[in-house]
Design a protein with these regions (language model features):
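Nucleic acid-binding interface residues in structured DNA/RNA-binding domains
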Residues: 2-145
Length: 145
């Protein structure tokens, strides 16, 4: 039997028991610190990205701060937050290709330091094009205003 690859939209809808909060284990405390870590659901990250208004941007770390605050945890997982923003971006690209007009504005999410994300649909070029269309200035794959 052939395996049917999931669409990005299906990946976005698959919460896998998330969100959840766990205590950071001693062996990970050197890197993440003491306390608790929230792992968001993919749809939770998508909903946060949808709230970013036209002309505004947010970094993945800013999204993480909102997630941690929402769940009352010390931090939000940087790995899953980044992966879920990537899934959200590709699900939005699928929606756009299907003719939907209102999609998640994935291009408004930046890496730390204002860097564009090469893993988003269309790579850095498409990321820059969409940000420029909203009035932002990009130089060396980085947002400058």
């Amino acid at each position: 039997m052939a395996y049917k690859r999931k669409t990005w939209r299906e990946k976005l809808a698959d919460d896998k028991g998330l969100p959840r909060v766990f205590t950071i284990q001693p062996r990970h405390q050197k890197r993440w610190g003491r306390g608790t870590c929230a792992i968001p659901s993919p749809r939770e990250v998508d909903a946060l990205i949808r709230k970013i208004r036209k002309g505004r941007v947010a970094t993945v770390n800013q999204l993480r701060a909102v997630i941690a605050n929402k769940h009352g945890s010390t931090i939000a997982c940087p790995i899953t937050t980044g992966i879920f923003s990537w899934i959200s971006a590709h699900a939005a690209a699928e929606d756009e290709a299907a003719g939907k007009k209102r999609i998640t504005p994935w291009w408004r999410v930046l890496k730390e330091g204002g860097k564009l994300n090469p893993k988003f649909p269309g790579g850095v070029g498409e990321h820059a094009r969409r940000l420029r269309a909203e009035g932002h200035t990009i130089r060396n794959s980085k947002l400058v205003s």
